[in-house]
């Protein structure tokens, strides 16, 4: 009998324990953090957001509402990162005229119908949590941050889901105006009295709250939705940055996962400090990377280097390739003697100087086409634009900032020198054709002189190329080296250096075109240059 009673007590205690555990588990699942993902482009942002939430010590559910545009691999990766993935259908934008990127943004309203949870904190994919925000679950029925012009921002919201509330929104979605053409404008119309709501104060005790009526909505302070756009205007936060809880990257196309944003927007450093700590939950995903981008980066980095080595090899293998180094050495010696003498040293001062650096005769100068300089400038800047466009198109967007910068420089320089080099070779060939048609004895003499050193390297072209490269690198790196963080100051310095670069390129392109045309006049009997794209030698 005693044993039976003991067994019954043990069974009763077990049932009570299970019930209590179930209750506690149910309580913990009544609230959640929620975000939306429309496509794979914002996947890295959601991953970093989740990591930032977990780094604050939160164990609440993290729910990612994903649309049909999200790949199965992305869903698998989010689950591996600890997100609960829920598939949803898009809500069409009812506005007749709206930006293309706002087509499905009304889908955000579906968070008001997440009735499995008592309360949810919604965070855009371009936000990060830098300090624990569990206090937001104390906020009333609807909470958001009031931005400039007395408009609420829907990037961070606290919502008490309700089917009745959601259905009411769906009935009014076609009748209420939206100043943005999206969900944010609709919510401002749906909650017209929001600017008059009181500010949420997480320090108020539960006892005090019980004595107050429950407000229909509350405003979140800037601490819970720190706008990077406003930061860039003043180059500082309007509040103590050590008290910030959420940073919101609102600068339109300048999203933190795009490598170039880090070179313009200082607060992106905080985002990348979280990104680099992302765990490898699936193979090749550590640090926010992916296997495809890693392979592309390696290919893009090695290909121009291999092409350069091949070009050098072909030059060395040439019958007169060694003269390139000799000419370069002679140029160094010339500069050394000039500095040492502290005066002007004529070209004849160094007897070993290549004849290609001697002044051209007036007869040869008269052969230069009238518009060659202007055409060369147009070709030069067209080559720059094409090089930049191709480089930004082929370099993956979501790689680390330094990696992206190095690859863009590498490919811009490579493509530019190839394009402009082909143009110089064309000008050189054009000079040859004109020289062949002319039977001027002065040109014959010039040709004979040049053929005695026909393989020597055109160091002047190399100097111009190095000058362009130096100014191009300085235009981006100098603000960083000087520690300038203000956006407009950075941009101003970059623009100033870019103007200097443009002036130098104008001068260099015009002089190089004339120089290579005159060399074509001299080289009309030499066929070695036209057979190689390695146009420096």
Swiss-Prot record:
Keyword Metal-binding found: yes
Keywords: Glycosyltransferase, Golgi apparatus, Manganese, Membrane, Metal-binding, Transferase, Transmembrane, Transmembrane helix
Site for Important for catalytic activity, residues: 108
Named cofactor requirement(s): Mn(2+)
Location in the cell: Golgi apparatus membrane
Pathway: Sphingolipid metabolism
Binding site for substrate: 124-126, 153-155, 180-184, 248-255
Transmembrane segments: 6-26, 293-313, 375-395, 406-426, 468-488, 494-514
GO molecular function: glucuronosyltransferase activity; metal ion binding; sphingolipid alpha-glucuronosyltransferase activity
Expression (tissue specificity): Expressed in seedlings, roots, leaves, stems and siliques.
General function of this protein: Mediates the transfer of glucuronic acid (GlcA) from UDP-GlcA to glycosyl inositol phosphorylceramides (GIPCs). The formation of GIPCs sphingolipids is essential for pollen function, plant growth and defense. Required for global fitness.
Family affiliation: Belongs to the glycosyltransferase 8 family. Glycogenin subfamily.
Protein name: Inositol phosphorylceramide glucuronosyltransferase 1
The encoding gene: IPUT1
């Amino acid at each position: 009998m005693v044993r039976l009673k003991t067994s019954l007590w043990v069974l009763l205690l077990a049932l009570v324990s299970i019930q209590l555990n179930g209750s506690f588990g149910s309580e913990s699942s009544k609230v959640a953090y929620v975000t939306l993902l429309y496509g794979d482009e914002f996947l890295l942002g959601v991953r970093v957001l989740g990591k930032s939430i977990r780094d604050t010590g939160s164990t609440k559910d993290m729910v990612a509402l994903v649309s049909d545009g999200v790949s199965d691999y992305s869903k698998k990766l989010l689950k591996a990162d600890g997100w609960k993935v829920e598939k949803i259908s898009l809500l069409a934008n009812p506005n007749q005229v709206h930006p293309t990127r706002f087509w499905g943004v009304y889908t955000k309203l579906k968070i008001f119908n997440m009735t499995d949870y008592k309360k949810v904190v919604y965070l855009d994919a371009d936000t990060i949590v830098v300090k624990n925000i569990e206090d937001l679950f104390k906020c009333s029925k609807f909470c958001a941050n009031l931005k400039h012009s007395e408009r609420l921002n829907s990037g961070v919201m606290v919502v008490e889901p309700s089917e009745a509330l959601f259905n009411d929104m769906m009935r009014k979605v076609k009748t209420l105006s939206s100043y943005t053409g999206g969900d944010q404008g609709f919510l401002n119309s749906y909650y017209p009295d929001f600017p008059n709501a009181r500010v949420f104060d997480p320090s108020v005790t539960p006892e005090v709250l019980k004595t107050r009526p429950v407000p229909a909505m509350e405003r979140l302070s800037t601490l819970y939705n720190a706008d990077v756009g406003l930061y860039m205007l003043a180059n500082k936060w309007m509040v103590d940055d050590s008290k910030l809880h959420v940073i919101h990257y609102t600068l339109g196309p300048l999203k933190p996962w795009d490598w170039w944003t880090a070179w313009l927007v200082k607060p992106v450093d905080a985002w990348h400090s979280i990104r680099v700590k992302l765990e490898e939950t699936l193979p090749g995903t550590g640090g926010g990377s992916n296997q495809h981008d890693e392979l592309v980066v390696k290919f893009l980095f090695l290909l121009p280097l291999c092409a350069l080595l091949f070009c050098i090899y072909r030059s060395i293998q040439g019958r007169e390739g060694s003269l390139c180094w000799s000419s370069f050495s002679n140029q160094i010696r010339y500069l050394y003697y000039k500095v040492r003498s502290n005066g002007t040293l004529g070209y004849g001062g160094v007897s070993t100087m290549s004849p290609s650096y001697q002044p051209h005769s007036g007869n040869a100068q008269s052969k230069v086409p009238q518009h060659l300089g202007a055409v060369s400038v147009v070709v030069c800047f067209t080559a720059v634009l094409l090089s930049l466009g191709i480089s930004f198109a082929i370099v993956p967007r979501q790689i680390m900032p330094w990696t992206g910068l190095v690859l863009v420089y590498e490919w811009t320089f490579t493509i530019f020198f190839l394009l402009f080099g082909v143009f110089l070779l064309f000008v050189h060939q054009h000079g040859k054709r004109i020289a062949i048609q002319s039977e001027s004895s002065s040109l014959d003499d010039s040709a004979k002189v040049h053929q005695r050193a026909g393989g020597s390297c055109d160091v002047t072209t190399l100097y111009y190329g190095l000058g362009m490269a130096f100014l191009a690198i300085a235009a981006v790196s100098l603000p960083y080296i000087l520690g300038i963080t203000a956006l407009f100051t950075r941009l101003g310095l970059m623009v100033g250096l870019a103007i200097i670069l443009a002036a130098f390129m104008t001068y260099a392109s015009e002089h190089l075109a004339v120089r290579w045309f005159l060399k074509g006049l001299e080289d009309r009997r030499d066929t070695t240059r036209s057979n190689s794209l390695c146009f420096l030698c």
